[in-house]
């Protein structure tokens, strides 16, 4: 009897769960939006992707190619209905023309259980007026002039990275796993350029700064489950006070940043890094606020306190630790697999070296290298670190095509996504997209690229604010590596990278193995 009652109870709970999971699945049919049939609980995410057997990136590209003729199509992310834009004109409207209606990212994941928590104060998480205030405060921090001041700090990290490679070669080890190598490099760059501390993750591979960075960026089962549950049940997750980030990691950075700020203020120390630039932005912000004659209510008055500053440092760390290393890994992979591109890049590097003579490489010379820029741009086309861009509709809105015809009627809080990776792999935008062709971005051909089909750093005012710094990190190390070493594939290097990627991460199963051969004295 107990077994029967238990079976009935389990069946009833299962039925409720099923009904709950499919409740939203009529959303796009009611609105006449093209979509593919979802499956309970997962929506349009295949089981094979969830189990790590296939790539979500490849799946999303294929889905785009099947539905792109509709300009807007629907995708169920678990049970959440998402509008995907495939038409450049609609992307322009959302990202540029009607930005005030599409200012914010989706709610939930980045806010955690406490809206006053540090992570909710980062530029990525802020919304509406508060975001605009912080963006305008931070924008002067990321100008070319300010980034140029960090070049020497990053160049020192380049030297440490190249010295490590040479030590490996001298010891008889010619093969290198690039993702780990580049992650250690980006860790050291962030440590010095953002937090003002010197670490060498090549000589001290288990240093605390690097270990915490790995814990923050690694994709664990529990971390993935938390993200999924925040998407499905954000209110419940907040009520249960489940933190998005490990608070021990947050406390580590809090002590690091606040300690550095206190010491610099007491000792009047000036160092051209992110903490200094943010402290300057904070001082400038407070001076403007004190001198302002605004009559707004005090509760609406903007602020930029130490927690706000810490939040931007944390964002800088979490955004730069993984994405720059990923870009470096894929750029090196493409140079390995396309030796003619590597040789052409080497020719430009040698020409620059000859032009410099005895002078060291500087920021302006590096950023002025045309073919290097083409190589990195093409790498970002094939392998954009941020594959998806999201926006939330702030009010009811009609999206219209170039002819003025209404394509879709959006409602307040509807979620709109732009599949950057799919746009970059669409043959209508980039012919033979699987081919690595840096010439797409040279002076002769770059005008052929349709506007709003190449978005490696996002679109509009909410595009990546730190893209100049990221590009400097990537280009400066690629310059030094190609100058000194010939990059070659090994037996462990995947010939078909897209087929080697699985799950939700932009990472091949075999990792990034590379053979390096010295070119002789640089």
Curated annotation (Swiss-Prot):
Cofactor: heme
EC number: 1.14.-.-
Compartments, as annotated in UniProt: Endoplasmic reticulum membrane; Microsome membrane
Molecular function as annotated in GO: heme binding; iron ion binding; monooxygenase activity; oxidoreductase activity, acting on paired donors, with incorporation or reduction of molecular oxygen
Sequence positions that bind heme: 464
Membrane topology: Peripheral membrane protein
Main location: endoplasmic reticulum
Top enzyme category: oxidoreductase
Keywords for this protein: Endoplasmic reticulum, Heme, Iron, Membrane, Metal-binding, Microsome, Monooxygenase, Oxidoreductase
InterPro entries: Cyt_P450 (IPR001128), Cyt_P450_CS (IPR017972), Cyt_P450_E_grp-I (IPR002401), Cyt_P450_sf (IPR036396), Insect_CytP450_Detox (IPR050476)
Lineage: superkingdom: Eukaryota
Any single GO CC term annotated in Swiss-Prot or TrEMBL for this entry: endoplasmic reticulum membrane
Role this protein plays: May be involved in the metabolism of insect hormones and in the breakdown of synthetic insecticides.
Family (UniProt): Belongs to the cytochrome P450 family.
Protein name as annotated: Cytochrome P450 9c1
Organism field: Drosophila melanogaster (Fruit fly)
